UniProtKB/Swiss-Prot annotation:
<protein>
    <recommendedName>
        <fullName>Acyltransferase abl6</fullName>
        <ecNumber>2.3.1.-</ecNumber>
    </recommendedName>
</protein>
<comment type="function">
    <text>Acyltransferase; part of the gene cluster that mediates the biosynthesis of abscisic acid (ABA), a phytohormone that acts antagonistically toward salicylic acid (SA), jasmonic acid (JA) and ethylene (ETH) signaling, to impede plant defense responses. The first step of the pathway catalyzes the reaction from farnesyl diphosphate to alpha-ionylideneethane performed by the alpha-ionylideneethane synthase abl3 via a three-step reaction mechanism involving 2 neutral intermediates, beta-farnesene and allofarnesene.</text>
</comment>
<dbReference type="GO" id="GO:0044550">
    <property type="term" value="P:secondary metabolite biosynthetic process"/>
</dbReference>
<dbReference type="InterPro" id="IPR050317">
    <property type="entry name" value="Plant_Fungal_Acyltransferase"/>
</dbReference>
<dbReference type="InterPro" id="IPR023213">
    <property type="entry name" value="CAT-like_dom_sf"/>
</dbReference>
<dbReference type="Pfam" id="PF02458">
    <property type="entry name" value="Transferase"/>
</dbReference>
<comment type="similarity">
    <text>Belongs to the plant acyltransferase family.</text>
</comment>
<dbReference type="GO" id="GO:0016747">
    <property type="term" value="F:acyltransferase activity, transferring groups other than amino-acyl groups"/>
</dbReference>
<keyword id="KW-0808">Transferase</keyword>
<feature type="active site" description="Proton acceptor">
    <location>
        <position position="171"/>
    </location>
</feature>
Length: 495
């Protein structure tokens, strides 16, 4: 697919502040600074307005009035530690307003059709596997900017009258929740500006936006601040299997010192696939695992992650490509700490779970893995998360995207479920496809809601099925699909 970039504009809030403003980002959020969120693409089959680019650019600027920090730039500074040591630590700072560069809005066009980028036959009542390698979305991704740049948006018009919105931003400023919050507000504002509709039922529940970088750290200061309690917090934090910028893998104890910086890992060498599970198939898999464990603590998403983890381990064993892989699973502070729903930022950590020694049968049993995941996540209580924040406050924030990359092969799973993509509409049109543009590493599984193709009489998030985006070596993927547990997954095309 050829895409022609017609123009590029710097984008700022509609009511941009005349003077610059700055804020020190939370320490936990800063662990993800200088990484971009996984760029998402929203594809629409039509636009009802006369000026696609102008309309979207205007509504984007208006939306940034509530999210001005997302158009800011990042840099590093040193601050004094609040103790008697006089020690300073490196922190990440965001600057917005004034003469800052802002974000980027790219206008592009292509002679391709939106439907050419969709699976040959999308039917939510069936489960399928689709090789996306010849349906690359990479040309729809915003052009590369310096790592300190703000939000990036590329709007691409298609020959058929449809359009695509590609979106990414710095991960320290926005986790998946914040991305969903932002696109939800943009959708609502755009619809109010450019349609005659007076009611917006899907956007009524949008929370007010809140930028309060010290919100979580204030919770730490509200706890017992005696020396003994602080040492207990440090011990607790360091006993947890939490991934840090200087500890990227459980097998690595290297620190960010001297010449131990390494270049980023090589890009994915695998093939991008989409696995779609129908609602009934998703329920069959997850309920089977939940019933086998007889534990009410095992949620449907934990059960499904354990299913995928076990299937990947079995596939790797069939291909003789290595031992069972570790699982890295993000856990958010938002719900455990009761953070405001409209709080923007990236308050999360990744939890590392052992894949087990080579040949261990239990690591191909999803029931065992579901129990391991649940018991590990149960350790991340409110007190544990506050301990992690305190421990992080004594460390430097990353100086750049170059950080320790000592790691072994692993599975990573992240969920985009529940962040409102099924409620979006720009004008009168809802997206016909939402997904990541690229998968930067192999064994990364991204789960999202299936797209609506018909009415579903259910309130469950997977009422239209569940989509899993993943990049795997072709032989591993073939072995994965040979698993009897995936017998109901239909192959689309020749993979």
């Amino acid at each position: 697919m050829k895409v022609e970039v017609m123009s590029s504009h710097r984008v700022h809030p509609e009511h941009k502040k005349a003077s610059e403003e700055t804020a020190i980002l939370p320490v936990i959020d800063s662990w993800y600074c200088y990484w971009r969120t996984l760029a998402a693409i929203y594809l629409f089959d039509a636009y009802s307005g006369p000026e696609l680019y102008t309309d979207l650019r205007q509504s984007l600027s208006k939306t940034l009035d509530d999210f001005p920090q997302l158009a800011g730039t990042l840099d590093n500074c040193n601050i004094q530690v609040e103790d008697k040591s006089g020690r300073s630590v490196r922190r990440t700072r965001v600057t917005w307003g004034g003469n800052t560069l802002g974000g980027e809005f790219i206008e592009a066009k292509t002679n391709a059709r939106v439907r050419s980028l969709l699976p040959p036959s999308i039917q939510n009542i069936s489960s399928f596997a689709w090789d996306r390698s010849d349906r690359t979305l990479r040309p729809l991704f915003p052009a590369t900017l310096p790592e300190t740049s703000g939000i990036r948006v590329q709007v691409t018009s298609f020959k058929c009258g449809g359009f695509g919105i590609a979106l990414d931003m710095d991960h320290a400023l926005a986790d998946a929740h914040t991305v969903g919050l932002f696109i939800g507000h943009w959708s609502a504002i755009h619809t109010r500006m450019f349609t005659s509709t007076t009611t917006f039922p899907s956007q009524i529940s949008l929370p007010n936006v809140m930028f309060n970088p010290q919100f979580v750290e204030k919770k730490v200061h509200e706890t017992d601040n005696t020396y003994g309690s602080k040492m207990v917090m440090l011990d607790r934090a360091r006993e947890l299997p939490t991934r840090r910028p200087d500890l990227r893998d459980k097998s690595s104890q290297r620190t960010m010192q001297g010449n131990m910086f390494k270049p980023p890992p090589k890009p994915s060498a695998g093939v991008p696939y989409l696995l779609h599970f129908s609602a009934s198939e998703y329920e069959r898999i997850t309920r089977g695992i939940q019933q086998a464990t007889a534990s009410p603590q095992i949620t449907d998403q934990v059960a499904f992650v354990s299913f995928l983890w076990a299937a990947l381990n079995k596939a790797r064993a069939r291909c003789s490509v290595g031992q069972a892989v570790d699982l890295h699973l993000p856990t958010s502070f938002r719900w455990t700490l009761g953070l405001p729903e409209g709080l923007i930022g990236s308050p999360l950590v990744a939890v590392m779970m052992d894949g087990g020694p080579d040949g261990e049968v239990c690591y191909t049993d999803p029931v065992v893995l579901a129990t391991i995941i649940t018991k590990t996540l149960e350790r991340y209580t409110e007190d544990a998360l506050l301990a992690i924040v305190y421990d992080a406050s004594l460390r430097d924030s990353p100086a750049s995207m170059l950080r320790g990359f000592e790691r072994r092969e692993r599975m990573e799973f992240t969920s985009g479920v529940g962040f409102g993509s099924d409620k979006l509409s720009f004008g009168c049109h809802s997206p016909v496809f939402v997904g990541p543009i690229i998968l930067p590493v192999d064994n990364l599984f991204i789960m999202a809601e299936g797209m609506r193709t018909s009415e579903a009489h259910s309130s469950k998030w997977y009422k239209h099925g569940a989509n899993i985006f993943v990049s795997l070596p072709q032989d591993v993927f073939r072995a994965l699909l040979a698993d009897p547990a995936l017998i109901n997954v239909e192959l689309l095309g020749d993979i």
